[in-house]
Structures are given as structure tokens and as C-alpha cells.
Amino acid sequence: MNKRLFPALVAFVITIIIGTFFFSNNGGEANKNAQILLEQLNKEGQKSQSLAENGSYTSKDEVALYIYKFNKLPKNFITKKEALELGWDAKSGNLWQVSGGKSIGGDRFSNREKRLPEADGRKWFECDVNYNGGRRGAERILYSNDGLIYYTPDHYEHFYLLYEKRMQ
């Protein structure tokens, strides 16, 4: 065998062995992740088809998708002002008793700390998610008038982009 070809052949064989090992170990993981992603996208597609414009929704995923799809909150949300007019007392956690099962949402969010993206004319709004009566929890969705939808699980400590509409 040619002496110049031997190192190239050895490098080729080593590359094949490493590649086989990598793809057999990580490839399985990649396929698993791809499968999970496809299942999630399929579920989202099914949810999107099953969301009714006149429906009531409270979960993070459903409310975010509803805002994305219909550009407004579901009918079961009222602003803080509307809740106060009904007799809501935040400290006592009586929102469901005075509102018939509504959640707080639709109020402006100031973004004072500038932790969410800013743009000319952009306005931010917020709503509670996963609310089950009593005192309000820490989970919120923040959504903008130009199509951005974020989730915070910990009362504005961390933000996660859920949807981004491309405005035309």
C-alpha cells in the first residue's frame, strides 16, 4: 500500500468509527427530540383548531394561543378596574366570588425595567394565567399590540417568548 495513502485511510476509518458512535448515541437522542417536537406541534395544531373565539381559557398555552389567533383575550378576562367595580378585594382573594369565575387581564404593563423588547408605538398588556381562584398567582402572559407574546412564571423575574407575529 502507498505510504501516503495509509494515513489518509486511517483518518477516514477513525472518522467513520467516531461518526457511527456519535450518530448512534446522539442520533437517537436527536430523533427522540424531533419526535417530541413533532408531537408538540401536532398538539398545538389540534388546540388551534379547537379554540373557540367565544371560549373561556386560563392555561398558559391556551391563553397565549388564543391571543395569537384572535388578537384579544378570551371572554373570561376582566381588567383590574372592572374587577374593583364588582367588589374585588385583592387581599381577600375574592375575585371568583364577585366576578363569576373571571381572571384579571387586559391592563397595561409599563415595562419600566425595559426587560421586554421596545419599539416605537409598542404597548404591553398583561393577564394572569393558570388562575384557580383566591389570591392571584405569579404567572402572567405579557402581550404587545404588535404581536409579541411572552410568559413569566415568576412575576416578571424571567420572560419567555411564546409567539411572535410578523406584521405586514
Question: Can you describe what each PLM-predicted range is?
Answer:
Residues 12, 78, 148-150:
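Alpha-helical interaction segments
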Residues 9-21:
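Hydrophobic membrane-insertion alpha-helices, especially the h-region
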Residues 47-104:
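Extracytoplasmic/periplasm-facing segments of secreted or lipoprotein envelope proteins
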Residues 23-25:
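Repeat-associated, polar segments at repeat-unit boundaries in modular proteins
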Residues 84-168:
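Functional cores of ribonucleases/endoribonucleases
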Residues 1-11:
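N-terminal Sec-pathway targeting helices
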Residues 40-41, 54-58, 114, 133-136:
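Short amphipathic alpha-helical segments, especially helix-boundary/capping motifs
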Residues 27-55:
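N-terminal, intrinsically disordered, polar/charged segments of Gram-positive cell-envelope systems
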